Amino acid sequence: MNIKTRFAPSPTGYLHIGNIRTALYAWLFARKQGGKFVLRIEDTNTVHLDNDEVIKNIISIMKWLRLDWDEGPYFQTKRLNRYNSIIYDMLQNNIAYRCFCSEERLSLLRLNQMKSGEKPKYDGRCRTICMFKNNAMLNTNRIIDSDKGSYVVRFCNPDVGKVSFYDQVRGMITFDNCELDDIIIQRSNGVPTYNFCVVVDDMDMNITHVVRGEEHINNTPRQINILKALRAEIPQYIHVPMILDQNRKKLSKRHGKSGIMQYRNDGFLPEAILNCLVRLGWSYGNQEIFSMDQMKKYFDFSEIHKSASVFDINKLMWFNHYYINHLPVNHIIKYLSEYIQIQNISDIDSVKLIDLVNLFSKRSHTLKEMIFNYRYLCKDFNIFEKKIAKKYLIPTMINPLKFFRKKLNNISNWTIKTVQTTIKETVHELNMNMNMVGMALRVALIGSDKSPSMSIVVYIIGKCQVLDRIDRAIDYINSLSHD
């Protein structure tokens, strides 16, 4: 069998956690089996909308995550002639029919069925009375019941027997055909529906394995019946469990913190996102960290869990911190450079990114946090916090601060190593309590008593700023002495 999977998002919203996990599972299976992966944009539901931005976002995110595709992207709106041609053939062969029932009649039908405890579904009225008229309309190319106005096209679903399929996550699933109604395959505006287009696409593109969310389970028997009516091969189905937020509610595309673009903008790495998502519903022993090669090697549908998974942002932060500190430094520099460009960050152009990575990776969970930590040290300030200044910027610290200034001013080659050595030698020469003098220097430089090591602070701020800030702290202490 030539394995072929697909990822078929609808451009009704930006890609979210659930979308990408589905894409990842389908991609991993295709790559593991040496098969092909197809990207398809299911845009018939948005045919009258301007969704270019969303489509660009889908393609951009897929490329950023390096989930490459072998075919596509295909667009359903460019295949309308194909769908309509098949619908025409189905009408001619009496496996579909025109339905002229008004919305008022259908609403009343649903209401009466619900009142009597029945499952709401179409009663097949036009199936029995319109079959002859459907053929007549095809032959004469005119609408016979012009007084009835617009119509939809429905599929003649079998009304007896069962439809069964083996789901590779849940096992055998069976539906009674009598429980399924004649679904609409073409709307009154002439646009084919999702349930029909997806069938034709999977058939034409020779999709062998359909990987999608469990919310599509009820669509599967309807789609299988259409495939059978078209005498097409039935693909294998894999319905993955839903993803919940930490309140155990469904994480949907409308959830503020589910969009992949948002995570990219927040400074998360592709490796961290994919590693986190592959573990949402799949496991391989107790292993947590997986490279892409390991994912392809170990991934199997049989290990996907049936129960819903909970997405934990703290877990994603943990993965991101791991990859920031374990990927090659040049990889992180590349990501950081791209992030700075995308976010239009202009205030760190002069900073050596390798220094930024080496100095802040241990205490940063995201690229955004890494830049924030840098900015926190470099930001200028005019006012010292009184409580902290009162404790550390005291008259006895004036001479130690002046001595530090002199030593730091003498550094000709400003590197992290020369700064570290100078600070160490200065503390030794002062023969003072490092906690006290170190805190005074820290408050002088960043206005706070919390920061990374002093050598990092001094190096990142830069020589000129360090000297200016020490002078300002000394002036501040002197001003208090004169009050």
From Swiss-Prot:
GO cellular component terms, A-Z: cytosol
Residue interval(s) of motif 'HIGH' region: 9-19
Chain ranges for the short sequence motif 'KMSKS' region as given in the UniProt record: 250-254
Gene3D superfamilies: 1.10.10.350, HUPs
Catalysed reactions, semicolon-separated: tRNA(Glu) + L-glutamate + ATP = L-glutamyl-tRNA(Glu) + AMP + diphosphate
E.C. number: 6.1.1.17
Entries under PROSITE patterns matching the protein: AA_TRNA_LIGASE_I
CDD domains per UniProt: GluRS_core
Subcellular location as annotated: Cytoplasm
InterPro entries xref list: aa-tRNA-synth_I_cd-bd, aa-tRNA-synth_I_codon-bd_sub2, aa-tRNA-synth_I_CS, aa_tRNA-synth_I_cd-bd_sf, Glu-tRNA-ligase_bac/mito, Glu/Gln-tRNA-synth, Glu/Gln-tRNA-synth_Ib_cat-dom, GluQ/Sye
Molecular function, one GO term: glutamate-tRNA ligase activity
Pfam families: Anticodon_2, tRNA-synt_1c
Transmembrane segments: none
GO biological process, one term: glutamyl-tRNA aminoacylation
Any coiled-coil regions, as ranges: none
UniProt xrefs under PANTHER family: GLUTAMATE--TRNA LIGASE (PTHR43311), GLUTAMATE--TRNA LIGASE, MITOCHONDRIAL-RELATED (PTHR43311:SF2)
HAMAP family: Glu_tRNA_synth_type1
NCBIfam families xref list: gltX_bact
Its biological purpose: Catalyzes the attachment of glutamate to tRNA(Glu) in a two-step reaction: glutamate is first activated by ATP to form Glu-AMP and then transferred to the acceptor end of tRNA(Glu).
Subunit comment: Monomer.
Family: Belongs to the class-I aminoacyl-tRNA synthetase family. Glutamate--tRNA ligase type 1 subfamily.
Protein name according to UniProt: Glutamate--tRNA ligase
Taxon lineage: Bacteria, Pseudomonadati, Pseudomonadota, Gammaproteobacteria, Enterobacterales
